[in-house]
Amino acid sequence: MKLIIAIINDQDTENVSDHLTQESFRVTCIASTGSFLRSGRSTLLIGTDEIRVPRAIEILRENTNQPKDPNEHKAIVFVVDVKEFIQV
């Protein structure tokens, strides 16, 4: 199992979340602020099987907009191993 941590612009959150959930990804959204430009961000937590990671990243690429500032990225994405997953 993998955990995808995606930091995206606030304006893209609803669109990205909708597309991910349409393909049965479970998404948790946390409001966050970047330290450099201090503008609105959302951090998405997406738990998924390793085989589905490429599709999740593809959805992120397709549904995020290029920021006006050339120093910004559409998204910052981390993919980390999940040692244990428990649902209570």
Regions found by a protein language model. Give the residues of each.
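Positively charged, small/polar-rich N-terminal and surface patches that mediate targeting and assembly
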Residues: 1-88
